[in-house]
């Protein structure tokens, strides 16, 4: 018999059963899921990159010729 894994909600820290039946996992509720989405949309959360990484990544995207 296996025990149901429990994680903490990334937004509020409440314990959450991490099962397929929990449609909000790893969040405890739709509210916490939307709070997290809003934080990403307003750039409160960011994925760290080297300062010049974007310049190299997008350097070929813009053609200086008109």
Swiss-Prot record:
Keywords: Metal-binding, Zinc
Recorded GO MF terms: DNA topoisomerase type II (double strand cut, ATP-hydrolyzing) inhibitor activity; zinc ion binding
Gene3D superfamilies: Erythroid Transcription Factor GATA-1, subunit A (3.30.50.10)
Requisite cofactors: Zn(2+)
Record GO biological process: regulation of DNA-templated transcription
Keyword Transferase: no
Pfam family, one: YacG
Record-linked InterPro entries: DNA_gyrase_inhibitor_YacG (IPR005584), Znf_NHR/GATA (IPR013088)
Binding site for Zn(2+): 9, 12, 28, 32
Cofactor binding annotation: Binds 1 zinc ion.
Protein's job: Inhibits all the catalytic activities of DNA gyrase by preventing its interaction with DNA. Acts by binding directly to the C-terminal domain of GyrB, which probably disrupts DNA binding by the gyrase.
HAMAP family, sorted: DNA_gyrase_inhibitor_YacG
Listed NCBIfam families: PRK00418.1
Family per record: Belongs to the DNA gyrase inhibitor YacG family.
Assembly notes: Interacts with GyrB.
UniProt protein name: DNA gyrase inhibitor YacG
Organism lineage: Bacteria, Pseudomonadati, Pseudomonadota, Gammaproteobacteria, Pseudomonadales
């Amino acid at each position: 018999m296996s025990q149901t894994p429990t994680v903490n909600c990334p937004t509020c820290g409440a314990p959450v059963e991490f099962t397929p039946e929990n449609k909000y996992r790893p969040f405890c509720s739709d509210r916490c899921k939307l709070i997290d989405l809003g934080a990403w949309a307003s750039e409160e959360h960011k994925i760290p990159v080297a300062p010049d990484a974007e310049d190299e990544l997008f350097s070929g995207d813009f053609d200086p010729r008109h």
